[in-house]
Amino acid sequence: MKRTYQPSKLVRKRRHGFRARMATVGGRRIIAARRARGRKKLSA
């Protein structure tokens, strides 16, 4: 059985990147929450 995590920079950026987050209302909330919390890294 193969492992579930098969790293890919492209898929990582497309799914969890900043622009992907900003594309939806829920994603915008995530970014806002991470900003409020003072996270150094907002997205992948």
From Swiss-Prot:
GO CC annotation, single: ribonucleoprotein complex
One Pfam family hit: Ribosomal_L34
InterPro entries, per database record: Ribosomal_bL34, Ribosomal_bL34_CS
A biological process from GO: translation
Keywords per UniProt: Ribonucleoprotein, Ribosomal protein
GO molecular function: structural constituent of ribosome
Annotated family: Belongs to the bacterial ribosomal protein bL34 family.
HAMAP family: Ribosomal_bL34
Stated name of the protein: Large ribosomal subunit protein bL34
